[in-house]
A protein has these predicted regions:
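Structural marker of alpha-solenoid helical repeat scaffolds
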Residues: 3, 37, 70-74
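Canonical positions in the second alpha-helix
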Residues: 1, 33-34, 67-68
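Canonical tetratricopeptide repeat
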Residues: 13, 47, 81-85
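Terminal, low-structured helical/coil segments at or just beyond the last alpha-helical repeat
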Residues: 62-93
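Residue-level recognition of tetratricopeptide repeat
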Residues: 7, 41, 75-76
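Structural signature of tandem alpha-helical TPR/SEL1-like repeats
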Residues: 20-33, 55-64
Length: 93
């Protein structure tokens, strides 16, 4: 990041590290940075949607699923998984 602050991959890896450490705030910050650098980064959209499901921010999840629908090339099956997790989270509320 020091040598190339526009490296979306570096921020994505940082987000994954913070996910493992269960630091939701820093995970979200880094995922948002990835999406600022590349709004079509499917993995960042997916991880941010999972984080928002965990935090019960369901309107944001729906928005992210719609975004994933429009940019999807490699992770198209992930949108079905997200939709399923969203539905089960909504039922448990």
């Amino acid at each position: 990041i020091v040598f190339n602050p526009k490296s979306e991959i570096s921020y994505l890896y940082l987000a994954k590290i913070f996910k493992e450490e269960e630091n939701d705030g820093l995970e979200e910050n880094n995922l948002n940075t990835v999406l600022l650098l590349n709004p079509k980064n499917e993995e960042a959209i997916y991880l941010l949607a999972l984080l928002n499901i965990k935090n019960s921010n369901f309107s944001k999840v729906k928005q992210l699923i719609n975004t994933l629908n429009t940019v999807c090339k490699k992770m198209c099956s992930s949108k079905l998984e997200l939709q399923s997790k969203l539905e089960s989270s909504l039922k448990s509320e």
